[in-house]
Amino acid sequence: MQAILSSWFIQGMIKATSDMWHKGWDERNGGNISLRLLAEEVEPYRRDFYQQPRKVELTQPAPELANSWFLVTGSGKFFRNVELNPAENLVLLQVSNDGMAYDIHWGLTQGGLPTSELAAHFQSHIVRMQVSGGTNRVIMHCHATNLIALSYVQKLENASFTRLLWEGSTECLVVFPDGIGIVPWMVPGTDGIGTQTAEQMREHSLVLWPFHGIFGSGPTLDDAFGLIDTAEKSAEIMVKVLSMGGKKQTISREQLIALAARFDVTPMAAALDA
């Protein structure tokens, strides 16, 4: 048996949370991450599990995730503290076989619960599992500064917001050809915002919460981080462009189509026409 603190998933979560905090995306207890794990990935670390796991009822049943394992950031925990004490700030949990509850097997050594956005994470995991054939295993939420800033001055519409980001940096269409989805402003930590986010996740791997932050999905922690990082970099460029008086020239529709053909991706049609 191996020590869980040396596992690839704990070490990966330490790196992701540290990187996100250093980016300035996760002030105080802002942001949350969940990583879906396979049973064989957690099995070698059972000696570190609690002998009597704590059971917590889900606010919304998730039978599609029955028996699934997740590594999740804790509610009220600071990303900057994860690398200092991962066992206090992270939690390894398993959804019950009926999808009505979960058991806490490791972590949260000072008590507490997984992220308050667990409902949004689980609903998004269900959808991304379906649309990706099970390859998407990460849901990541943070307060990316420039994406939030743009939500105050741009029309909150999927196609036009996507087009703006595609024009902000050439790599964007290649990295997220499926564009960005947007939900209305809603109270966070509720089942309702989770439902709205999951609906957008059916078509988009990025979902903007206006005036709040961004949700991203991907196969790995690196993929999800890189996705958000790319969109945020484009948003930063566009914030600077707007502050200098707006665009004088930009990437054209024809150039975007040529870019998609070169990298063999299918761009969001509505964004091409926005």
UniProtKB/Swiss-Prot annotation:
Its EC number is 4.1.2.19. Keywords: Cytoplasm, Lyase, Metal-binding, Rhamnose metabolism, Zinc. Pfam families: Aldolase_II (PF00596). SMART domains: Aldolase_II (SM01007). Zn(2+) binds at residues 141, 143, 212. Binds 1 zinc ion per subunit. It is found in: Cytoplasm. Catalyzes the reversible cleavage of L-rhamnulose-1-phosphate to dihydroxyacetone phosphate (DHAP) and L-lactaldehyde. Belongs to the aldolase class II family. RhaD subfamily. This is Rhamnulose-1-phosphate aldolase. The lineage of its organism: Bacteria, Pseudomonadati, Pseudomonadota, Gammaproteobacteria, Enterobacterales.
